[in-house]
Amino acid sequence: MALTYYRTYAQAIAKVQETADVTRAVAQSVNGGQGVIVVRDLTAQDLGAQAVAIPPGNFTVTIASGVVPSGKAFGIYGFELTTPFVRIANGNLVGLVLDTYVGGSRVKRVYLDVVNDSSETGLTYYIADKSIVMKQQIQYSFVLSGVNNTGSTITLMVNVLGFVGEPSGVTIIEQ
């Protein structure tokens, strides 16, 4: 069986660099090879991601969805379940699955249960096989499903780890 995920950033560093390089190449291609392309970290704002309320029992929630903006490319190398951290090991959340859809088709299914490291800092899943790279005008969505056994609603945030390739000077960060 082929390895599908890495446990640590140190193990994943080559895949992370490969994702950055491919994201840059795709962004260069969608911009007709013109201008300087920069690669920066993908943010929740890029994806429209936000914390979601996980109801008790079986659930399916959309973490983020949208369309890759013109002139840009998104490259994804991992996912991180962040605060407030709920210990999966204690059975609070089971069957936790994150599906990634690109252009309406599921391209990646991640079983977040398998990366339970019993820490209080969160769960991180680094993709070991093929990274997900999306070019401009491609529709995407990230859908989380599973079972919440806590008896109450939990608020969770799933960070999508990746890069944005774009022409230099496109992004303006508001202070």
PLM ranges: what are they?
Residues M1-Q175:
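Beta-strand-centric surfaces of beta-sandwich/beta-rich domains
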